[in-house]
């Protein structure tokens, strides 16, 4: 399965800056930080090369982990645990993506009155987790007229899975799923996870582009909606 591959987690001073299936984002971030350091150096000591103390970050690390570890990390990660590099618009889109699986819900637990809970880590996963079309997601971002700009920002998401860009798919895919599901309503498998998994595995359903590959996007969607891998 595509999910058997290793994931590279990049951290800067302990905060997650990237999650990907290769080292390209590590190289990109390292290059960006080096450039920022050079600019900072010029501000501190203009015209005096050799100063390397301008970098505003002290440590960048990368580790390879498995899919299950990444899934667990996703449930432990708060928005404040991320360090994202991008425009304000991109960060707005990424935050809205993050909210698809990390929505804040007020608890009714008397022992934790007024606090926010989710899987024991300060947030709660929404019960009605589902796929979202690009146009509907653009509306969530209050930018329905700018679907292409929103889609472009989604494609640049540096922290795959933790920021679940795989949940945004073409509207045609959602319509196709509903059509197949409607036919399944009449069967004894109605609502069964096996039936849902079979529908999501249907090769006629195209879930769209994904930076880590189309097949992996399908497997991540199946995990999200059924709780198990394909």
Identify the residue ranges that each predicted region occupies.
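Regulatory, non-catalytic segments
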Residues: 145-160
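Catalytic-site neighborhood detector that most strongly recognizes the C-terminal catalytic loop/helix
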Residues: 208-214
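Extracytoplasmic/periplasmic beta-strand context in beta-sandwich domains
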Residues: 152, 166, 218-219
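Glycine-rich, flexible loop motifs
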Residues: 175-179, 208
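Short Lys/Arg-enriched helix C-cap and helix-to-coil transition segments
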Residues: 161-170
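Basic nucleic-acid-binding alpha-helical/helix-turn surface characteristic of O6-alkylguanine DNA
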Residues: 1-144, 182-200, 204, 215-230
């Amino acid at each position: 399965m595509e999910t058997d591959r290793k994931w590279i987690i990049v951290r800067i001073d302990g905060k997650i800056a990237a999650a990907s299936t290769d080292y390209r984002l590590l190289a990109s971030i390292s290059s960006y930080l080096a450039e920022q350091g050079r600019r900072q150096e010029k501000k501190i000591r203009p015209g005096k090369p050799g100063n390397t103390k301008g970098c505003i970050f002290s440590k960048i690390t990368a580790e390879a982990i498995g899919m299950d570890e990444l899934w667990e990390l996703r449930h432990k990660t708060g928005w404040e645990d991320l360090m994202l590099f991008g425009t304000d618009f991109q960060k707005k889109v990424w935050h809205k993506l993050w909210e698809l699986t990390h929505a804040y819900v007020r608890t009714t637990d008397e022992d934790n009155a007024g606090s926010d809970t989710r899987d024991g880590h300060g947030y709660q996963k929404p019960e009605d987790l589902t796929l979202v079309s690009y146009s509907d997601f653009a509306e969530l971002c209050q930018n329905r007229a700018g679907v292409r700009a929103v889609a472009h920002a989604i494609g640049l998401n540096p922290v795959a899975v933790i920021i679940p860009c795989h949940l945004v798919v073409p509207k045609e895919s959602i319509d196709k799923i509903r059509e197949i599901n409607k036919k399944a309503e009449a069967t004894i498998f109605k609502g069964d996870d096996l039936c849902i998994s079979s529908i999501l595995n249907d090769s006629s359903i195209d879930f769209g582009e994904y930076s880590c590959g189309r097949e992996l996007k399908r497997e991540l969607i199946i995990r999200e909606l059924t709780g198990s891998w394909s």
